[in-house]
Structures are given as C-alpha cells and as structure tokens.
UniProtKB/Swiss-Prot annotation:
NCBIfam families named among the record's database cross-references: thermo_KaiC_1 (TIGR03877)
Residues reported in the UniProt entry to bind ATP: 30-37
Database matches in CDD domains: KaiC_arch (cd19486)
PROSITE patterns: KAIC
Pfam families: ATPase
Family listed: Belongs to the UPF0273 family.
Gene3D superfamilies noted in UniProt: P-loop containing nucleotide triphosphate hydrolases (3.40.50.300)
Entries under SUPFAM superfamilies matching the protein: P-loop containing nucleoside triphosphate hydrolases
Name of this protein: UPF0273 protein PYRAB02580
Amino acid sequence: MTRRIKTGIPGMDDILHGGIPERNVVLLSGGPGTGKTIFSQQFLWNGLQMGEPGIYVALEEHPVQVRQNMAQFGWDVRKYEEEGMFAMVDAFTAGIGKSKEYEKYIVHDLTDIREFIEVLRQAIRDINAKRVVVDSVTTLYINKPALARSIILQLKRVLAGTGCTSIFVSQISVGERGFGGPGVEHGVDGIIRLDLDEIDGELKRSLIVWKMRGTSHSMRRHPFEITDKGIVVYPDRVLKRGKILEL
C-alpha cells in the first residue's frame, strides 16, 4: 500500500481519497489568478507542520517576495529555514545583487538544466526534503517548448529517486485547453487543473483532478476559495454548466 502524503488543504485530501501517493510528481496547471502558487505554498507549509522538510524553487518571483507573500497567510518559513527544515532555491535572480549574500542555493544559468538539477539535488540532500515545489516549471522550457517533456522527466527522475513528493506549477494562458507545454501531461504522475470562470457576472474558482497515479479520486469539478488562511476546497459541491450544485 503506497503511503499517502496529505496536502493538508481543507477538502483537498477528500477529493484525492486520502492524499497524494508518495513520490508522485503532480502538475498543478492553471491560468493567471487561479491560485496555483498559493496551493503549492500551502502544501509545503502543511508539510512543515507535519514534520516533513520542504523546498520551494523560485523561478517567477524574488525569494524575498516569496517569503513575504507566504507570511501574509501566516506561513512564516524563516524559522524553519534556520532549523534546516525548509530551503529556498533561488532560480530567479541568477545570483545578481544581494541574493548571493542571503541565499544558500542559487541557480546561475537557467539554460543549464544540469546545474539546476545539481543545485536542487544538493538542497534535497542537505535538509532531507520530503516535499518539493517548482514554481513554475514552465519557465524552464518557455523558450524551448520541444524540450518540455524531456525536462519534466529529468526532474521527475531526480525527485522520485530521492523519495520526494513534488508539485510542478504549470502556467497556461486564459482559455487554453492543455496543461502547459507539449507532452508534459504524459511525463507526470498526477494533474490538478485550477480554473477561473465567470458565473452570473462573478469570477469563481474551481479545480479538477485530471489524473493521479496510485489512487482513485473524484472526477468532478469542485469549487474552492482563497481565504486569509489559504485555499479551502469544497468536496461536497460541484461546478456544473455554470452553476454550483450541492452534492
């Protein structure tokens, strides 16, 4: 029986029938404003509360900004960094400016996937990480989409090999039907897609689990909200043809 890794996000583990199977790599796909980053950070924070060390790979935002944004939800990771439970991999600044003074793990050349993997592997080793978030994986192949699946598989090999359960944040444009990059959906164990739809003149958030290797899961689209404590998913409600229905 595969061990389950609880997301700790209210309602989400019900939809996943117990959590994400250990070592799975999950693509968290969605357009702008859908809540991808918050979901992934909440997954890491909840892991820390369960005693599971975690790593956040920052590709889209300055690491300082990431820490500030997390703290707004009450997720202050600095204490865990000092205790060797949490690590930030800076793949945003390339070590320019003051980052090299503050950040321990820096990727200097994003076009060199081997350097990226080596820095990530070192961070995993140092803190014995159990959870990893890459935000966003799309940045790694935005200029070379043909390599998307290859890059995903290289990362998956390293992460699953070290026993980590991982979330790859994947960006898609508004209205796009795919998951962000050609063939990426075939290189991961799970896909959770977040959406933002207009219903009766109001934007509503929802998510659906497209696939999750190693477990059954809800096949319905469930609404969720972003609160001041993070994401809350409603497993007893379904978004259907522009309406939210109670189950």
